[in-house]
Amino acid sequence: MNIVCFFIVANKTSYCIIIINYEKDIKERSTFRYILGLIVRWKQHFKYDKAVRIARKRGASIGENVVMPLSLAKAANSNLKIGDHVSIQTDKIDLRKPVTIGNHVIIGSETEIITTSHNIDSEEWEHKHYGLTIEDYVWIPTRVMILPSCRKIQYGGVISSGSVVVKDVESMSVVGGNPAKEFKKRKCVHKNLVVESLLGGDYYTYKQTRRSKT
């Protein structure tokens, strides 16, 4: 079993993610364990597939192997674009302007993305609308707030939990705090992680991996 462990430290809090070798684990399973895993994943697949179908019907562009809550799907519109192998646990995404999410992105629960503000220098106090682009291999964990002044989170960016993001995040930067500031650079991205498996949404990937057994 190959395990990769990395830490993010911000505000004196440490986080650890343990990633098991997905392909090796599935290929070495007994037939009984494989079928059991398939049954569990089928139940989750039905739920997540329904959400994706609803989001697409509402005009959103959704890639393959995407896990998202039903509540987000019901609020989706043509401003939402999501790539492949994405896990989203929040429904607090402001879709009054385009939000583009790349491939292999992880967004945790209670994270909020805001794309609209007000013109504080105007007597009418009218709305000001912005969009957000989240590039590939970005990790946004729990309870992050992304304000309209942030327009892009670049490739491999990581934001620590509870942070308030007020400006763009550079590629491979690890940021945290309020306001979020960079405190280190990420050494690699999670290329070996099957992102959709984090919430049990890997029904198709699970089957394909098993079938490729040599």
Residues covered by each model-derived region:
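Extended, small-residue-rich solenoid/repeat segments and analogous flexible loops
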Residues: 21-79, 211-212
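C-terminal segments of enzyme domains that contribute to small-molecule binding surfaces
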Residues: 26, 126-146, 178-214
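Residues at secondary-structure transition points
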Residues: 77, 96, 125-129
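Left-handed beta-helix
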Residues: 64, 69-70, 83-84, 88-90, ...
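A short acidic, helix-capping loop that chelates divalent metal ions and anchors anionic groups
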Residues: 121-122
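Ala/Thr-enriched low-complexity intrinsically disordered regions
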Residues: 10-13
